[in-house]
Amino acid sequence: MDQTDQTTHFGFRDVPLGEKQTLVNDVFHSVAQRYDLMNDLMSAGLHRVWKDIMINTLNPPKSDAPFALLDVAGGTGDISFRAARKAGAGFHATVCDINGDMLEVGRQRALKQYLEDKVSFVEGNAEKLAFPDRSFDAYTIAFGIRNVPQIELALAEAYRVLKHGGRFLCLEFSTVEVPGLDKLYDLFSFNVIPQLGRAVTGDAESYRYLVESIRQFPRPNAFAEMISAAGFSRVSWQTLSGGIVALHSGWRL
């Protein structure tokens, strides 16, 4: 069966597998310039806390020893910039994103923060990375893997490009665990976020997709099984903010 016969979800819609990436690209082309502002508004700034927890968990070395981070779907550079500020002189991050508009926002932000020597930007596909085997010490992906058409391929590529002893970290929206909060979260997600997107970016539909895509993503235990199936060891996860997000970890050992 080729991609013309297979289907996948795009939000709550079923679409041909080969079309999903184009649809996702259109979403991020539309919102790139206001993406970081919308993250602040949608999460009341909590995304900053979640990302800081991710980087504290990664704990990049503060020494001069070389440390190479691959930040996939990292477009505007948030994760890489945080890691660069925490790390030592040997640190370098490569931001890999399939969307050129998001990367351009990241490049401009790197210049403004004087981090252009610490963070580089490469256009590429998470399902087929253009990097040699065992070339990175860590792989991060924040709020990006649910947009990948074939998650299993992205996980296999993450494993391939990590060095022995390298760490995989994935921050992604999850399933709310707190009774009562789930209903409030749904109300906010489906009614407020698309209208907020319309007001800030002029695009409600892209944010309706983003909300729907969260509900389609596997629960933490199911996603952890996918990470293990890709070859990772010591797979674990922790939920944050009542289960709104989960931070997944795995090692190439």
Swiss-Prot record:
Q: What class of enzyme is it?
A: transferase
InterPro entries cross-referenced by the UniProt entry: SAM-dependent_MTases_sf, UbiE/COQ5_MeTrFase, UbiE/COQ5_MeTrFase_CS
Q: In which pathway does it act?
A: Quinol/quinone metabolism; menaquinone biosynthesis; menaquinol from 1,4-dihydroxy-2-naphthoate: step 2/2; Cofactor biosynthesis; ubiquinone biosynthesis
User: What Gene3D superfamilies does the database record attribute to this sequence?
Assistant: Vaccinia Virus protein VP39 (3.40.50.150)
Which residues participate in S-adenosyl-L-methionine binding? Answer: 76, 97, 125-126
Q: Source organism's superkingdom?
A: Bacteria
Query: What CDD domains does the entry give?
Result: AdoMet_MTases
What EC number is given for this enzyme? 2.1.1.163, 2.1.1.201
Q: Which GO terms describe its biological process?
A: aerobic respiration; menaquinone biosynthetic process; methylation
Q: Which GO terms describe its molecular function?
A: 2-methoxy-6-polyprenyl-1,4-benzoquinol methyltransferase activity; demethylmenaquinone methyltransferase activity
Instruction: Spell out the reaction equation it catalyses.
Output: a 2-demethylmenaquinol + S-adenosyl-L-methionine = a menaquinol + S-adenosyl-L-homocysteine + H(+); a 2-methoxy-6-(all-trans-polyprenyl)benzene-1,4-diol + S-adenosyl-L-methionine = a 5-methoxy-2-methyl-3-(all-trans-polyprenyl)benzene-1,4-diol + S-adenosyl-L-homocysteine + H(+)
Keywords, ordered alphabetically? Menaquinone biosynthesis, Methyltransferase, S-adenosyl-L-methionine, Transferase, Ubiquinone biosynthesis
- Any one Pfam family here would be Ubie_methyltran
Record-stated family:
Belongs to the class I-like SAM-binding methyltransferase superfamily. MenG/UbiE family.
NCBIfam families on file: MenG_MenH_UbiE (TIGR01934), PRK00216.1-3 (NF001242)
Quote the function comment for this protein.
Answer: Methyltransferase required for the conversion of demethylmenaquinol (DMKH2) to menaquinol (MKH2) and the conversion of 2-polyprenyl-6-methoxy-1,4-benzoquinol (DDMQH2) to 2-polyprenyl-3-methyl-6-methoxy-1,4-benzoquinol (DMQH2).
UniProt protein name:
Ubiquinone/menaquinone biosynthesis C-methyltransferase UbiE
Organism name? Bradyrhizobium sp. (strain BTAi1 / ATCC BAA-1182)
- Taxonomic lineage of this organism? Bacteria, Pseudomonadati, Pseudomonadota, Alphaproteobacteria, Hyphomicrobiales
